[in-house]
Amino acid sequence: MSAIEVTADAASTWDWPLQHNDGVVKVHNTKEKFEVGLDVQFFTPKEIEVKVSGQELLIHCRHETRSDNHGTVAREINRAYKLPDDVDVSTVKSHLATRGVLTITASKKA
């Protein structure tokens, strides 16, 4: 299993927020590339883990904060995607935009 580094935009750029009808996850599978877009606006790059295991893309996000003496508030997302057979797993890259969208892309095999 190999971990994929999550890069992030600097906070100096601003973009329109996602619209309500955009959904939480977008998956695009074209002849040229495979791409997943995931809304992770409540997580920092250090709280996001992206891995490839065989032909499976694994995404784990975890944010934990203590709110008071009575308990803990935590947010966690786990996603797994079967990569198409024609995806070159060595090209998987992830990027976190300032608006909170994690985009994971991979090229197709030639």
From Swiss-Prot:
Residues 15-110 form the sHSP domain. The lineage of its organism: Eukaryota, Metazoa, Ecdysozoa, Nematoda, Chromadorea. The keyword Signal does not apply. One of its GO terms (biological process) is response to heat. The gene is hsp-12.2. GO terms for molecular function: heat shock protein binding. Keywords: Stress response. It comes from Caenorhabditis elegans. It comes from the Eukaryota. This is Heat shock protein Hsp-12.2. PANTHER family: HEAT SHOCK PROTEIN HSP-12.2 (PTHR45640:SF35), HEAT SHOCK PROTEIN HSP-12.2-RELATED (PTHR45640). The keyword Zinc does not apply. Belongs to the small heat shock protein (HSP20) family. GO terms for cellular component: cytoplasm; nucleus.
